[in-house]
Amino acid sequence: MEVIINENERSWVIDLISKTNFILSSNDLIIKKAGGESTVSTQSTGRKKNMFPDLILYGNEEKSVILQGWEIKMPDTPIEDEEFIKDAQRKAVALNLNSCIIWNFTYAVLYIRNENDEFSILKQWNTTSYIQSRADVKIYQSDWEQLLEEIIIELNSYFISGQLHNAVIGNVIAENIITTLIKRNKDVISEYLKNSAFCNNVLSAYIDNWWIHLKNEYEHDESDKYKAYAKSIVLSWANRITFAHIIKNRQNGALLINEFNYDTTPREANEIFSRITAKCDFYNIFSSMNYDEIIPVVSWYDFIEYSNFLKNNGIDHLNQEALQNILEGSIAVGKREINGQYATPPELAKILVRLSVQDWRDTILDCCCGTGTIPREAILIKKNQLSAKEAVESVWACDKYKYPLQIANISMIESDTIRIANRIFQHHALSLSVGDDIIIVDPETGEKL
């Protein structure tokens, strides 16, 4: 089955979304909004299946509560097409939803998922079974629009009954999407890196050296250096995109993330993140990895689609608790995927911090911070007695390696401290000396402190 739809088919998807919104505006339903057009691409790149549904129903105007995803095809794709069905169900699972709809203008089918992740048909609509071709879609437009309204009204009843469940965008990001990005792209990027290294001895030597120092971190997870590095690339891009969208409502410099589109290259994306860093710092989160631009187009479009999804799905309107869930979810995925075997458990970190610190007014340094569990706990403990600003500014952290610092920096941030500069930097602990100059940038002004 062709994955990237043509312009004609895309226009019908957009029409379907527009008509759905018209129906919703004329009724008072649990379903409040329809969207999804921003993640539909017409690029012909041999791309994998899209990550997100063609049409998404939302439970609020801000589009932060997701109700259901629809997959849309034209009548020349049979409603019983297995790939069509599986694609819709896969996306429902990725969005943590228990239902999905497939629609080909001839038929519409509602699937429901049970606790064992098994889907079954809950309802099928056959009213427009006489629509058999793309030409018929235009001829009988008023007919399928009438059916669409009937479906929306029926779906409202299913949601009222509790039979169909929703998902909150914050939980979806924290629990599902980043893991999905890794599963979809790790092997593809790994193979691309391997082929590129065959023609580039500098790249080959760099990954060899990187693997020598970090192999032990992956020994229970990855035995292939290219797959390990590919996983780091996926997490790095995902974390940068996620964090930029999280802070853009508080940091105007991060609004540059909205410039991402299907014409943006990885190199141009890195330039955008450099501009964001210049305006609001968070260098350890937004800085690029070496060779992270060596990524196939089919994988790169996943990151663009993810950014578009965040751009248009209510992340600006999440409350502090939801934003904190996203931050903590990103941390958990990063630790689990990269060095979960060696991450300090939070309870142990609390004990170590309390055993090590005599006066909580003192400045604290963790010079081998890894993914930041210990400095995070130090900040949380300090905040019980000190202001958030005093707590953050008196806890320092560094590590020899770059990627853990991205996770550590996210780990040390809470929704109430986004405007405060973390004292975190890359440095080898054994060469760290009193008097070394460390540059910290104010995230509000972009000026050096």
Model-found features: residue ranges?
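Acidic-basic catalytic patches of nuclease active cores, encompassing PD-(D/E)XK
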Residues: M1-S44, L352
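Alpha-solenoid helical-repeat scaffolds
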Residues: V3-N6, R10, S232, D316, ...
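Membrane-embedded glycan transfer/ligation machinery
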Residues: R10, I14, F243, Q320, ...
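Long, charged, glycine-rich C-terminal linkers/tails
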Residues: S25-K48, P346, C368, N422-A429
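Charged, often flexible domain-edge or linker segments that flank or initiate folded functional domains
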Residues: P53, Y58-N60, S64-I72, T77-Q89, ...
